């Protein structure tokens, strides 16, 4: 039986567990090590005034970060932002600094702008090789595919991406994979539903299907409830495509929010909204709770006045990151 969640009454709903076809990740197995993707907010080093990654760990309880974005440097060649080399630059230094501080990183491919590898690489095997170059460069244990624009809206490119990820999953046993994509308040729309169905059809089993419940394009009065509603509808899609239980489905779902003011002038994800998302994630043991981005996790002022460098809300530094640090599945 599926219960409808109400933000004000989390404890009223209890889901029963059942076996399913989707492989249960470390989130559900009780392994002692927390998956990297579970609580790893995004940081982007390409603009603004980014917070030093190791400094984020030192200032908060967070252990892991998701560094963004790897794009195409032309043809099918991966590079940070499509321009910076994989090795010998600031991005490799950032990864090394996080690991030296006792943490780890996931690397995110794609994002909202730039040339995407899924489009530039003309076959699934070539795209898998591009992903593998990045995995091998850093010995990665976790990757995120932030699939947007043509990668998301073109059926042929979507299928190429999931086929490439299936190759990566076979070649790297145990690797964590998140597929992150846009959603409506009513849940994934046609492209998102097709993405899930295509992945299930070829046996791809991501650690997390992560929705981005913001930039809805219409006024939303309650961003926490809108986010929860989107997740509940995503659960339906996973049940339909993978034929699994509700419990297993939730353990393979993620929320990637946006802290403070979003790209929409009438949207704000407040600290209180994010606290409710945290409570929901804890209730249903979601695979992932994250946000865009650590760069913005501070009040505006001084050198940090652009929307890329601050949240636009009244907050303490790292207020959203501190909440993610509380999440342990």
What is the role of each PLM region?
Residues 1-28:
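Secretory targeting and sorting signals
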Residues 15-19, 48, 288:
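Hydrophobic alpha-helical elements and their junctions with loops/disorder across both membrane
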Residues 23, 83, 291, 297-299:
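Intrinsic disorder/low-complexity detector
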Residues 32-211, 215-244, 248-274, 300-327:
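Chitinase-like catalytic core of GlcNAc-active glycosidases
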Residues 249, 282-284, 293-294:
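C-terminal "post-core" interaction segments
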Residues 254-257, 288-293:
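Conserved active-site loop/cleft motifs that coordinate metal ions or position small ligands
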Residues 270-287:
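Short, low-complexity, polybasic intrinsically disordered segments
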């Amino acid at each position: 039986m599926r219960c409808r969640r109400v933000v004000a009454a989390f404890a009223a709903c209890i889901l029963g567990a059942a076996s399913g076809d989707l492989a249960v990740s470390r989130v559900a197995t009780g392994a002692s090590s927390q998956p990297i993707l579970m609580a790893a907010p995004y940081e982007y080093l390409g603009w603004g005034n980014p917070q030093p990654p190791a400094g984020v760990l030192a200032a908060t309880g967070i252990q892991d970060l998701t560094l963004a974005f790897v794009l195409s440097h032309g043809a099918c060649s991966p590079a940070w932002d499509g321009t910076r080399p994989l090795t010998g630059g600031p991005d490799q230094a950032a990864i090394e600094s996080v690991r030296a501080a006792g943490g780890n990183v996931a690397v995110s491919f794609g994002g909202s702008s730039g040339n995407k590898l899924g489009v530039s690489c003309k076959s699934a095997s070539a795209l898998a090789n591009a992903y593998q170059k990045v995995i091998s460069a850093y010995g990665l244990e976790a990757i995120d595919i932030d699939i947007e624009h043509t990668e998301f809206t073109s059926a042929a490119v979507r299928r190429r991406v999931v086929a490439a990820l299936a190759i990566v999953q076979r070649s790297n046993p145990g690797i964590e994979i998140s597929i992150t994509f846009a959603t409506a308040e009513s849940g994934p729309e046609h492209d998102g539903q097709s993405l899930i169905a295509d992945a299930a059809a070829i046996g791809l089993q991501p650690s997390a299907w992560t929705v981005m419940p913001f930039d809805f394009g219409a006024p939303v009065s309650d961003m926490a409830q809108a986010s929860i509603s989107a997740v509940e509808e995503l659960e339906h899609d996973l049940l339909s495509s993978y034929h699994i239980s509700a419990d297993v489905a939730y353990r393979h779902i993620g929320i990637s929010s946006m802290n403070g003011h979003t790209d929409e002038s009438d949207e704000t994800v407040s600290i209180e909204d994010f606290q409710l998302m945290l409570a929901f994630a804890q209730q249903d043991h979601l695979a992932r709770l994250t946000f865009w981005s650590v760069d913005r996790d501070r009040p505006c002022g001084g050198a940090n006045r652009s929307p890329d460098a601050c949240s636009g809300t009244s907050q303490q530094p790292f207020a959203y990151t501190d909440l993610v640090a509380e999440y342990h599945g």
